[in-house]
Amino acid sequence: EKLSQYTRFPSLTLSTDGGVGYKSRTSTLSFDSSGVPIPSEHRQREIFERYFSPNGGAPTKQRRKSIHQGKKIVDLVLEDSKTLKNRLGSNDKLKLDEYLSSLNQVEEQLNRNERWLDIPMKDFDASLINLDVDPTSAPQDYVRSMMDLMILGFQTDATRVISYLMAREDGMGFGDNFPKIVLGLKGHHTISHDRASGHWEDWGRLDRWYAKQFAYFIEKMKNTQDLHGSLLDNTMILYGSACSTTHNA
């Protein structure tokens, strides 16, 4: 919250699968102050257009009109919800409150967008970012394109807080197939439960592959200059791993 007052967006929440998943199979690393999961985004082109090319680079007048239309829609929904709430039971009221909380966040972002409307974004070159790569066919290119978008977020100071869940290991997400596609191994979830002889070598190969992607991110951060030096020198980065075996840390 402290950092968000200086940027266009409070945070950027990314993953390879998008959404929030569910309690034991989350697909986001971000939660709000109430513990509610923040939906993650995973389609590169949509991410780019939403955060770095609002309204497809439309003129300011058109973008202002779009913001005002969005605010009107939010106001109408909020007004209707007040009438609806009086007719709901206690459980449904709780669900509605969750929805209204999300709607308030939308309204807050619309107001933020309006405040930043006349402030130009820093110049950047996105020509080398692949916005159309598919995680099911080119995992490395996909992961690195997401990292490129993260760096762009820091470089333009669009946000100062970003999370990225590279892969779920529950056997359900795109990332579960990464070791199959890039290394010819079993699925991520299968490897994590494997007790056969030699399975640690498979774990090691997969961990090394992820470490290489992280190294790519670190190197690009190091070579991207900020006002006070490299992005790497001015950023706190936390890189975490999955369980070592079955459900054990």
Q: Over which residues does each language-model region extend?
A:
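Ligand-binding pockets and gating/stacking loops
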Residues: E1-A249
